[in-house]
Amino acid sequence: MKQTVYIASPESQQIHVWNLNHEGALTLTQVVDVPGQVQPMVVSPDKRYLYVGVRPEFRVLAYRIAPDDGALTFAAESALPGSPTHISTDHLGQFVFVGSYNAGNVSVTRLEDGLPVGVVDVVEGLDGCHSANISPDNRTLWVPALKQDRICLFTVSDDGHLVAQDPAEVTTVEGAGPRHMVFHPNEQYAYCVNELNSSVDVWELKDPHGNIECVQTLDMMPENFSDTRWAADIHITPDGRHLYACDRTASLITVFSVSEDGSVLSKEGFQPTETQPRGFNVDHSGKYLIAAGQKSHHISVYEIVGEQGLLHEKGRYAVGQGPMWVVVNAH
């Protein structure tokens, strides 16, 4: 398995393309100059395209991915109704979902043969919309509205329209600020990192009565932490055994172990990392974690070790200015 790591650096308007080898070392293979401040990125389900959101002219760009080395070639673009904060796709590669924090909306862009061709739906009134996360069964789009302490739930119709479910939302505790999400591989649990109180919620996707329920909330931070809380990103290993979340003020990655059924998180430790870690990701083997420092302009690679999933630094690399997003593609 070959793996390519893409790093988005909006301040220098670049995507750095790296080869990740089996020992966790990175080799720079390409630097792409992007026409705008590139932030969120996602790889298409068939691994043929990288979709990126850019500002200040709000667009989604599609780059064709070379199957041999992961190199990028521009392919298409489509306008967006707001500044892109987060970008994702459905599992069939039919739609791109874009959450916009500033516009307070989530939009759906239709794909034709992998290329974006236009917005087919926009839902407004989602104050601080920070991500759009399709469930493993491709049926429910989870959309956190950070400023409203709620996660809205939509069914995606065959033509890409978003239909509010019943219930239409789940709520967090007041002042939590739900931000980014991941799902357990067993498809029974979701995990949401809350920006404003630096906590992680565990959501049971459907209990025996058909309800969605928060079954656990864990504080991410060390006991003696008294500064402003400012959590950012969350990811889980492919085997579902280890979960990680980062806080930008503390420049820490919190390490959690996950119970076998996915219902319980246990805090295992903390890893100091790059300054102001806005984004990170886990590779497809589940062996390495790559974190980007928005203020350090570097990335660090960590090996995931032991039953606890603690992090051991393998290498550090300069990237563009203000790196914010990390995507790993296996090919």
Curated annotation (Swiss-Prot):
Q: Please list the GO terms describing molecular function.
A: 6-phosphogluconolactonase activity
SUPFAM superfamilies in UniProt: Nitrous oxide reductase, N-terminal domain (SSF50974)
Q: N6-acetyllysine is carried by which residues?
A: K287
Q: In which pathway does it act?
A: Carbohydrate degradation; pentose phosphate pathway; D-ribulose 5-phosphate from D-glucose 6-phosphate (oxidative stage): step 2/3
Q: Which GO terms describe its cellular component?
A: cytosol
> What EC number(s) is this enzyme filed under?
3.1.1.31
Substrates-to-products reaction catalysed: 6-phospho-D-glucono-1,5-lactone + H2O = 6-phospho-D-gluconate + H(+)
Q: Does the keyword Hydrolase apply?
A: yes
State any GO BP term from the record. pentose-phosphate shunt, oxidative branch
What does this protein's UniProt record list under function? Catalyzes the hydrolysis of 6-phosphogluconolactone to 6-phosphogluconate.
NCBIfam families, alphabetized: PRK11028.1
* Name of the protein described by the UniProt record: 6-phosphogluconolactonase
Tell me which species this is from.
Escherichia coli O1:K1 / APEC
This protein's gene is called pgl
